[in-house]
Amino acid sequence: MSHHWGYGEHNGPEHWHKDFPIADGERQSPVDIDTKAVVPDPALKPLALLYEQAASRRMVNNGHSFNVEFDDSQDKAVLKDGPLTGTYRLVQFHFHWGSSDDQGSEHTVDRKKYAAELHLVHWNTKYGDFGTAAQQPDGLAVVGVFLKVGDANPALQKVLDVLDSIKTKGKSADFPNFDPSSLLKRALNYWTYPGSLTNPPLLESVTWVVLKEPTSVSSQQMLKFRSLNFNAEGEPELLMLANWRPAQPLKNRQVRVFPK
C-alpha cells in the first residue's frame, strides 16, 4: 500500500523501505555534510540560475508538503552549470520543516539541523519530461536552501500568505508571478553530491546542489508552515508539524564543494 507513506510513527521514514526497497540504496538523500571531508573540485563551475522568465502557476497541498508549481513547457526558468551538464528546467519548489525551530532541514551540516529546507526541483531537458527524467541517473537537479531562524523573510511571506487557502490535502490555489530567485541569497556557493528524492519513490536520479548560505525565516513564519494539514478536508485533523527525512548513509560517495 505504497500511497500510505507519511511522516508518522507507523508510516514514517523508518518504514518506507518496506514499500520502497531503494530506501536502503547506494545513493539516498539527504546526507550529513561533513565540512572537513568535502572535496574541492576545480572542474566545478559557478551555478547559473536563470529564473528571469519563471512562470509560477499554482500552489498545491499534496498531503506531505505543498508545491509551488511552474510552467515547464519551455526553458523559462532553468538551472545550468555548477556540477551539471545540460539544461534543467524548474518544475516546482517545496519545503520540509520540523515541529520546532531546532530541526526540520533534511540535509545537515556537521550534524547541525536548520529549521527548514527549500527544495527547487529541476529536470534535465534532454529527457523530454519530468516523469522520464526522474528515472535517469542524471535526470533531476535539486537546489537545497537552508532556512535559519532570524529575521522575517518578506519573499517567503508571499508564499505563506496563501497557505490558509490550501490547508488540507488536495487543495490548490492560483499563485502567478512569483519570482523564485527572491528566496535565494546572492552568494551561490554550494556543496554537491549524487543522491535521491527524499520522499517516496526515493528515486536515485538527483544531482544535489546544497547552498552553503542559509536564507532567513522568523519563528512566527515557521508557525505558519505547521498550520497545514496532512489530511484531506473532512478527515480527522493531522497537523503537518514535521515532514523531514533524517540523514542517510553517505556510503561510497563524495561531497564536492564550490568554490574550492
UniProtKB/Swiss-Prot annotation:
Pfam families for the chain: Carb_anhydrase (PF00194)
A cellular component term, taken from the record's GO annotations: plasma membrane
Residues bearing the modification N-acetylserine: 2
Residues with PTM Phosphoserine: 2, 165, 172
GO MF annotation, one: carbonate dehydratase activity
Residues annotated as domain Alpha-carbonic anhydrase: 3-259
Entry EC no(s): 4.2.1.1, 4.2.1.69
Binding site residues for substrate: 198-199
Fine-tunes the proton-transfer properties of H-64, annotated site positions: 7, 62, 67
Keywords of this entry: Acetylation, Cell membrane, Cytoplasm, Lyase, Membrane, Metal-binding, Phosphoprotein, Zinc
Subcellular location: Cytoplasm; Cell membrane
Binding-site list for Zn(2+): 94, 96, 119
Biological processes annotated in GO: angiotensin-activated signaling pathway; carbon dioxide transport; positive regulation of dipeptide transmembrane transport; regulation of intracellular pH; regulation of monoatomic anion transport
InterPro entries tied to this protein: CA_dom, CA_dom_sf, Carbonic_anhydrase_a-class, Carbonic_anhydrase_a-class_CS
Active-site residue numbers: 64
Activity regulation summary: Inhibited by acetazolamide.
Catalysed conversion reaction: hydrogencarbonate + H(+) = CO2 + H2O; urea = cyanamide + H2O
Cofactor: Zn(2+)
Family: Belongs to the alpha-carbonic anhydrase family.
Function: Catalyzes the reversible hydration of carbon dioxide. Can also hydrate cyanamide to urea. Involved in the regulation of fluid secretion into the anterior chamber of the eye. Essential for bone resorption and osteoclast differentiation. Contributes to intracellular pH regulation in the duodenal upper villous epithelium during proton-coupled peptide absorption. Stimulates the chloride-bicarbonate exchange activity of SLC26A6.
Subunit organization: Interacts with SLC4A4 and SLC26A6. Interaction with SLC4A7 regulates SLC4A7 transporter activity.
Protein name: Carbonic anhydrase 2
Gene name for this UniProt entry: CA2
